[in-house]
Amino acid sequence: MTPDGAVDYDGAATLAAYLVDDMRSEGLVVSGTTGEAPTTTDAEKQRLIEVVKDAVGDRASVVAGVGTNITAHSVELAKQAERAGADGLLVVSPYYSKPAQDALAAHFTAIADSTGLPMLIYDIPGRTAVALATDTLVGLAGHPRIVGIKDAKGDIAASSAVIARTDLAYYSGDDPMTLPLLSVGGIGIISVTAHVVGPRISAMLDAFADGNNAEARQHHLSMLPVNVGLFRNQAAVMTKAAMDLLGLPGGGVRGPLLPASEAERSTLTDDLTAGGVKLPAAGEARATSMNGATL
């Protein structure tokens, strides 16, 4: 965000290129939790997709967060994302209303039916107040465009049950749980900490895929201070503060969030340093530095 609260699209483009070229991200989610999706307008969401697609070209896929607590609105956002050039959709469970399982299935099916894009379901009951049951996910796995799960349920047994009964691609949606999820069949992560330790996350994934569990475990343990630091407050707040510390697009947040305090920034500096993140010296700026918006 710019100082006056507007979306800085130039900053978003700069950050997108950094995440792909420097942090080795193979895909980007636009309008997710860290991108403050609840407080951006539909028009802003569309423009962000277009800007990020232009910035990364064919170097990474662009997935649009389109989930809301209104089915018809989510369907319209999905159609808008397809028109804007998104490569896929990420759809969080509808929040606040606490739908029953059959209603959740109907909600996700309506969105998946509305476009030709592949779709990931975001299961995060800590934010939505309702968890997706195993049988619900198994049933949804039969839809040809529902291809995977962003899993932030924090229940390895439940995740394992779905993995065992479906071909859904399971991505961790909680950074500290990535390695445990890989051990039961997960394939990757949709990450917050990849904003600062992307290459190390890639190295952990590669080590695990190569059967080098000790190396994967060491990467996992070495990143724990970063995981702690970026979640001491809401992820968008702390990630934007981290981007500012790195001389990258960060900027403010929209209410009801507040920016990180000076005390929080100081603690975050210590956390990142403990996690092996090299921060620019005071007054030193990256060539790509500018005020902007975290995706």
Task: Enumerate the predicted regions with their spans.
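Positions that flank functional sites
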Residues: G35, Y96-S97, G126-R127, T178, ...
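A general structural signal for well-ordered alpha-helical segments in protein cores
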Residues: A12, K45, I49, S74, ...
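Helix N-cap/beta->alpha junction signal
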Residues: I70, D174-D175, S261
